[in-house]
């Protein structure tokens, strides 16, 4: 049921379609997380990496369902800060949550920008600071262009990311034929060391699933 404290009107333009928002959400989940972290998770969990991803996906799934429920009850662009305000009605708590989101977003953006340098230098050998500056300015211009335009660009990039993952699956298609006979190898033994490795891998793998929480921040701009 819609909360009576949430106003029906909004000053933001509702220009985003459901397909655009869906692609935007997929794009924030895919990308740097899934492409970069597979190797990191495998480094921690070894052959048990699929179990780490499975555990992380279950935890992320519960979190995603919580966001879906909250965003339907409180469709505000403030997202997590609005939810905290509705739950506790204490301004400093909602402010702390809001600033935490800003800080986390800044750290994540910086991390991804640093990771981008390695890929960029494959094509053009430039100083790290220059590559990061070009990326930040370019993305800033796209973001300032408008919500519909920027999410359209993000959706196009998402489609490219999905095609990239599908290409990997197709190229490695022959290897999947061996999986049924090797499933037992992916099940961790009842050993503390093995499950510790799985837990460490799951901790990293969770980052590969995050991104869905960004969708709630455009709730007031969806048609």
Regions found by a protein language model. Give the residues of each.
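Membrane-interface "cap" regions at the ends of multi-pass membrane proteins
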Residues: 1-48, 61, 65, 77
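Helix-loop-helix junctions that connect adjacent transmembrane segments
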Residues: 5-13, 50, 125-130, 134, ...
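Hydrophobic/aromatic residues within transmembrane alpha-helices of membrane transport systems
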Residues: 17, 31, 70, 215-218
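Hydrophobic/aromatic residues within the transmembrane alpha-helices of Major Facilitator Superfamily
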Residues: 26-30, 58, 103-106, 206-209
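Hydrophobic alpha-helical segments of secondary membrane carriers
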Residues: 33, 99-103, 153-156
């Amino acid at each position: 049921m819609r909360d009576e404290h949430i106003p029906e009107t909004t000053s933001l333009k509702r220009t985003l379609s459901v397909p655009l928002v869906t692609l935007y959400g997929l794009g924030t989940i895919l990308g740097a997380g899934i492409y970069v972290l597979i190797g990191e998770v495998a480094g921690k969990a070894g052959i048990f990496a699929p179990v780490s991803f499975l555990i992380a996906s279950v935890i992320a799934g519960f979190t995603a369902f919580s966001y879906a429920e909250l965003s339907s009850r409180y469709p505000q662009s403030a997202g997590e800060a609005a939810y905290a305000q509705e739950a506790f009605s204490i301004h400093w708590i909602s402010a702390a949550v809001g600033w935490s989101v800003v800080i986390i977003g800044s750290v994540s953006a910086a991390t991804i920008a640093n990771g981008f340098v390695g890929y960029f230098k494959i094509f053009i050998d430039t100083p790290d600071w220059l590559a990061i500056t070009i990326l930040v300015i370019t993305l800033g211009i796209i973001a300032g262009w408008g919500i519909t335009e920027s999410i359209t660009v993000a959706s196009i990039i998402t489609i490219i990311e999905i095609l990239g993952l599908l290409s990997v699956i197709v190229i490695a298609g022959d290897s999947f034929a061996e999986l049924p006979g090797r499933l037992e190898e992916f099940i961790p033994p009842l050993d503390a060391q093995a499950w510790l490795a799985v837990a460490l891998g799951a901790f990293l793998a969770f980052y590969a699933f995050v991104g869905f929480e960004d969708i709630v921040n455009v709730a007031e701009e969806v048609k």
